[in-house]
């Protein structure tokens, strides 16, 4: 062979990623025909592809074989053929998207009336590498805003939408929304209220339709209104071909009948106000009912069905909450200061999800939050063998002193998965978000800071090494070691240390449940703005600002050894301090 040629010139590969983004927007004022009328169009096309090239060639070779038995003797060996470089190319990934939007708009003031109206058609087409990836949607919408005398406002939107993801006969949906507002501060009876600068009441109602569909792990979209068939190999053990695999096709999931859009009924009321010539206030509350949510109907069928149960539009979830925002700016002599904050509280409840019948009430999930944590209630650790003997039997694994002792929730004298109950809050999103900011400036010298926090937020501390040590050859953290149970430390935070997996201790339970709430100093900045007269002397610079900025410098939380936003086996969030100069021309 020719090793040098083979290693250096026999083959190479090249990968190409190609992207095309094209946008076209056209608008035309038609006031010459109808005052206030206009027309607009927009086209966009995105294309992405990944191409892989493979180049290869062959070489002729010559070699020598030497034999020394009766003196040196050489034998020539040759073979192969020299060929031209061959090329093979393939596309291993691609995606494309086309969007079109066009319509008419009308904007005009008629006496005390302000009118804006829009009639629009949208079309979207998406396609990508793989099976069942083509999706198209279209919307026909009409939106109208009407204002009267700068006091009363009415908005109406009507939307008809179509989606290819849903079954024939159910592709179209109608979504109406309406909102109204009343600016009380413009009324004559409010003119003498000096401390109210602006006051508006508003309310809205709408129905939103969505074409969400359940998907499998590779994001494939199935046609759930059809039966799904699966092909597999089955072993027939007879005759000479006993070890051969023969394909078989069977129904793996039943079809969904009358599939439709998921619907959200949204209600909102709010107040916007400006008080005392500087205090801006926003208060609003909302209620939402989502229905026809896609859920599995598996809980409604016996396990002898023999195939996967269909998905159904049967889920119902209620959500409600409130948001409050405050901002106040005031100037006293040469000092300008600003302070404000936001608070949001949100809660939800599962009303229906076709849940299977449960043996005990504590196992029922309907009526609880989305993404609620379920686990066992820990009552401490077993002190000794007598404590174990006098306690309900725990069936997860053999227990010894130092293992977690659980509460018998259902009272059957045995601890197992039937003793799980709702514990803590959601691990996905907190119920409460809040933030507040403050800042001040004096003759160009100033500072600003923004804090952000969460509450009613849970974490399950199941990270191996740190909280579950020595499992599958993982390491042991000093945090666990210092807080483990020992006969001398009966009030420990964590169970005894074990070199083997311990099914009893590593169930989801209140030992591993932690409050994930936190308060962080998100941003803080000290700065100096150079005087304008100095900038004018440069005849080049319009402004200049020297600053020192810090990000995520402080965190107050109850998870001491990890960041509450990234407490798993991942890179921690970074703290940073930046010194910079911002220049404007």
Language model features: what each stretch is:
Residues 1-56, 65-373, 504, 508-585:
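Extracellular/periplasmic, surface-exposed regions of secreted and cell-surface proteins
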Residues 61-62:
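Active-site-proximal polar cores
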Residues 85-88, 392-403, 479-484:
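Residues embedded in well-ordered regular secondary structure
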Residues 117-125, 153-162, 406-429:
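Catalytic-site beta-strand/loop segments enriched in glycine and acidic/polar residues
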Residues 217-218, 223-224, 331-428, 468, ...:
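Conserved small-residue
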Residues 309-318, 357-375, 423-435, 439, ...:
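C-terminal extracellular loops and terminal segments
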Residues 413, 447-519:
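C-terminal beta-barrel architecture of Gram-negative outer-membrane proteins
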Residues 427-460:
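Glycine-rich, aromatic-lined ligand/substrate-binding cores of catalytic
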């Amino acid at each position: 062979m020719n090793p040098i040629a083979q290693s250096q010139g026999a083959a190479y590969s090249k990968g190409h990623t190609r992207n095309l983004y094209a946008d076209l927007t056209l608008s035309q004022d038609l006031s010459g025909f109808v005052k206030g009328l206009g027309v607009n169009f927009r086209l966009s096309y995105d294309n992405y592809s990944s191409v892989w090239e493979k180049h290869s060639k062959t070489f002729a070779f010559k070699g020598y074989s030497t034999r020394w038995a009766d003196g040196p003797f050489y034998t020539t060996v040759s073979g192969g053929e020299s060929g031209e470089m061959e090329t093979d190319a393939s596309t291993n990934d691609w995606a494309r998207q086309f969007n079109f939007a066009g319509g008419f708009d009308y904007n005009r003031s008629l006496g005390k009336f302000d009118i804006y109206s829009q009639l629009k058609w949208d079309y979207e087409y998406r396609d990508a590498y793989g099976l069942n990836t083509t999706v198209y949607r279209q919307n026909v919408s009409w939106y109208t805003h009407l204002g009267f005398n700068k006091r009363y406002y009415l908005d109406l939107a009507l939307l008809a939408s179509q989606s290819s993801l849903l079954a024939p006969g159910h592709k179209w949906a109608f979504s109406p929304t309406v909102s109204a507002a009343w600016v009380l501060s413009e009324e004559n009876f409010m003119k003498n209220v000096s401390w109210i600068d602006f006051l508006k009441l508003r309310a809205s109602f709408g129905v939103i339709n969505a074409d969400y569909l359940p998907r499998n792990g590779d994001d494939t979209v199935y046609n759930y209104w059809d039966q799904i068939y699966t092909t597999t190999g089955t072993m027939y053990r007879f005759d000479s071909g006993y070890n051969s695999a023969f394909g078989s096709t069977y129904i793996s999931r039943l079809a969904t009948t009358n599939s439709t859009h998921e619907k959200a009924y949204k209600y909102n009321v709010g107040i916007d106000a400006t008080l005392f010539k500087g205090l801006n206030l926003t208060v609003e509350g909302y209620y939402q009912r989502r229905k026809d949510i896609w859920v599995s109907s598996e809980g409604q069928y016996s396990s002898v069905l023999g195939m996967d149960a269909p998905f159904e539009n049967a889920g119902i979830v209620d959500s409600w909450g409130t948001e409050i925002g405050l901002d106040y700016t005031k100037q006293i002599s040469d000092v300008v200061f600003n302070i404000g904050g936001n608070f949001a509280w949100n809660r939800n409840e599962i009303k229906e999800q076709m849940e299977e019948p449960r043996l005990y009430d504590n196992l029922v999930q309907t009526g609880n939050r989305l993404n609620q944590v379920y686990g066992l209630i820990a009552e401490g650790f077993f002190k000794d063998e007598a404590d174990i003997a006098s306690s309900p039997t725990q069936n997860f694994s053999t227990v010894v002193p130092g293992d977690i002792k659980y509460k018998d929730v259902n009272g059957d004298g045995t601890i197992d998965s039937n003793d799980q109950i709702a514990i803590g809050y959601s691990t996905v999103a907190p119920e409460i978000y809040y933030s507040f900011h403050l800042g001040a400036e004096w003759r160009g010298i100033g500072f600003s800071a923004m804090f952000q926090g969460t509450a009613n937020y849970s974490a399950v501390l199941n990270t191996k090494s740190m909280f579950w040590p020595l499992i599958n050859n993982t390491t042991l953290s000093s945090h666990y070691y210092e807080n483990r149970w020992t006969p001398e430390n009966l009030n420990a935070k964590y169970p005894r240390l074990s070199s083997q997996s311990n099914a009893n201790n590593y169930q989801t339970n209140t030992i591993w449940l932690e409050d994930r709430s936190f308060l962080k100093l998100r941003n803080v900045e000290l700065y100096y703005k150079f005087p304008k007269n100095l900038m004018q002397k440069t005849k080049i610079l319009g402004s200049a600002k020297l600053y020192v900025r810090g990000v995520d410098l402080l965190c107050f939380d109850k998870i001491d050894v990890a960041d509450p936003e990234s407490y798993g086996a991942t890179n921690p969030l970074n703290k940073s301090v930046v010194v910079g100069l911002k220049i404007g021309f």
